[in-house]
Amino acid sequence: MSDPVIKRALVSVSDKTGIVDFCRELGAMGVEIFSTGGTLRILQESGIEAASISTITGFPEIMDGRVKTLHPKIHGGLLAVRDNEDHVGQAKANGIEFIDMVVVNLYPFEATVAKPDVTFEEAIENIDIGGPSMLRSAAKNNESVTVVTDSADYATVLDEMRSNNGATRRETRLTLARKVFELTSRYDRAIADYLIGAEESGETEAPAAISVKLEKELDMRYGENPHQSAGFYRLVDGQGSRCFDDFFDKLHGKELSYNNMLDIAAATGLVEEFRGEDPAVVIIKHTNPCGVAQAGTLVDAYRKAFSTDTQSPFGGIIAFNVPLDMETALAVDEIFTEILIAPAYEDGVLDMLMKKKNRRLVLQKKALLQEVMEYKSTQFGMLVQDRDSKIVSREDLKVVTKRQPDEQELDDMMFAWKIAKHVKSNTIVYVKNGQTIGVGAGQMSRIDSAKIARSKAAEAGLDIKGSAVASDAFFPFADGLLAAAEAGATSVIQPGGSIRDDEVIAAADENNLAMVFTSMRHFKH
C-alpha cells in the first residue's frame, strides 16, 4: 500500500503551542481541517479555514464538551482499513469519510493534580475521554493514519509531507503511533495513581502500585566511576514529569557528569532550606556540606562558609539562595570550583566567571518540587518513600533541660538542624552565629562523627565554645552529648526517642546545656 495522501485532519489540542502555524501550513497544502471547542475558535480567529466536528457527526457537542468526538463517523473514519473492500463499503453505506490525520494532545491531568490546592472534582474534569479514544483509533490504524501528539513533531511532519507529495512515510507513522501508546499508558497510570492516592488519603501506606517511566535526556561520559556507563533520564510518574531542564539552565562549562548531578541535587536541596531568607551559601563536596553560612551580605556568608573548611571547597559545588553579585563572585573566583548555582547572576558576573572554561555555571529557574516520591534502586527491587521535606519550626521544639536556650542558641539550633537533615548519617553539626563550625558526616558511630566535627573545627581554627550542636538522630548514650559539652557547645538539638533519654537529659543538665527535642529524625543513607 502506498503512503496515503493527507486530505482530512482532525485537530483538538489542550496545549496549543504551535498549532496555528501548523494548521496554516496544512491548509496551504489543501488539507481539510475539522476541530472542536477552543481549538476551533483559535484557528478561526487566526484566519484558518476550519470546520466544527459537528459537521462530520451531525450531532452537537453536549454535556459541557464531555461528548463531542465519541461518534461512529469519527472512529469509523479513523479505523477503516483502506484496502479492505468490506470496510470501504460499510463506510460508504453509512456516510463515513476517511480521516487521514489526528492532531490531539490531552487535558493536562498530571499538571492539574500536581497543584497543591487541586480538588477532586477539578481532577476528575481533567480526565480526557475523547482524546485518548481518537489517539488510540488513529494509532491502531497507523498504516493509513498519521497521528500527532507532540508539538515538537509538527515541523518533521510538515517537512515530510512537502517532500512526499502530501503524505507521511510508513516509518514515521509507526513512530508516531508508538508515542501515542506511551502517552496513553502513562496518562492512564497517572489517573489510577491519583485515584489510589485519593482513596488512601490520610493513610500512611505507600501506594499499592506505581508506574514510573524514564525517558533518556542525555548520555553521560560515564557514571560514578569511569568503568560505569550512565545516562540522565526524565522521570515521569503519577506526580508528573520532571527533569533537570525544567528547573535549571546550564549557562557555561563542560557537560554535567553523573557526580555533578548528584552534587547539584544535594546543594540545591540544602540551599532551598533558606529560600526567602537572608543571604546563604552552601558548599558541597561529594554530596555532603563542608561549609554553610548565612549573613547580612552574600560575600560575608560565603567567607563564613568557606572558613569552615578551606580545603574541601576546591573542586566543590557552591549554591546561593540569592542572586550572585560581583563582590561574591570575585571572592569565589579565587579558588577552583566545579559548579556555581544561583537563582540569578548580576550584571557582569557571568562574563567574569566565564573566563574559566571548565567551571560550570548553573541558573536555578524555580524551586524544586518538595512533595514528590523518592526512589532508590537496589539489585533486588525499588524502595519508595516520601521526600524528607517536613519542616520543624520553633513551635515544634520541646525544651527538655532545666536551662532554656536563649535567642541566639535557638537561631543556631534551627540553623544546625536544617543542615543536619542534608548530611550523611551518622551526623553531628556544630553551628555558631549562623555558620557551620564543624561537620561530622557518615560515620558508623555517632561519637566518631562528633570527634570528626570537633577536629574539623580545630583544623579551621574555629572556636566551638558557645556553639549549638545538631544530631540527625537521638544520642543512644550520653557519650556523644558529653563530647559536645567537652568541646564547648552550650545547646543541643536532636530528635529524642532513645530509651536512655533520661540519662542524656541528666548529662545535659549536669553540664548546663540547653537541649531541645524535635521528635523528628533525619537519617540519610
Swiss-Prot record:
Disulfide pairs here are none
Do you know which InterPro entries this protein is assigned to? AICAR_Tfase_dup_dom_sf (IPR024051), Cytidine_deaminase-like (IPR016193), MGS-like_dom (IPR011607), MGS-like_dom_sf (IPR036914), PurH-like (IPR002695)
Higher taxonomy: Bacteria, Pseudomonadati, Chlorobiota, Chlorobiia, Chlorobiales
Its protein name is Bifunctional purine biosynthesis protein PurH
Annotated source species: Prosthecochloris aestuarii (strain DSM 271 / SK 413)
Q: Name one GO cellular component term.
A: cytosol
Reactions accelerated catalytically:
(6R)-10-formyltetrahydrofolate + 5-amino-1-(5-phospho-beta-D-ribosyl)imidazole-4-carboxamide = 5-formamido-1-(5-phospho-D-ribosyl)imidazole-4-carboxamide + (6S)-5,6,7,8-tetrahydrofolate; IMP + H2O = 5-formamido-1-(5-phospho-D-ribosyl)imidazole-4-carboxamide
Q: What is its EC number?
A: 2.1.2.3, 3.5.4.10
Please name the Gene3D superfamilies in this protein's record: 3.40.140.20, Methylglyoxal synthase-like domain
Please report the stretch or stretches of sequence annotated as the MGS-like domain. 1-149
Concerning PROSITE patterns, the annotation shows: MGS
Q: Which GO terms describe its biological process?
A: 'de novo' IMP biosynthetic process
A GO molecular function assigned to this protein is: IMP cyclohydrolase activity
| CDD domains referenced in this protein's UniProt entry, alphabetically | IMPCH
Q: Which SMART domains match?
A: AICARFT_IMPCHas, MGS
Q: Which UniProt keywords apply?
A: Hydrolase, Multifunctional enzyme, Purine biosynthesis, Transferase
Q: In which pathway does it act?
A: Purine metabolism; IMP biosynthesis via de novo pathway; 5-formamido-1-(5-phospho-D-ribosyl)imidazole-4-carboxamide from 5-amino-1-(5-phospho-D-ribosyl)imidazole-4-carboxamide (10-formyl THF route): step 1/1; Purine metabolism; IMP biosynthesis via de novo pathway; IMP from 5-formamido-1-(5-phospho-D-ribosyl)imidazole-4-carboxamide: step 1/1
This protein's encoding gene: purH
* UniProt domain comment: The IMP cyclohydrolase activity resides in the N-terminal region.
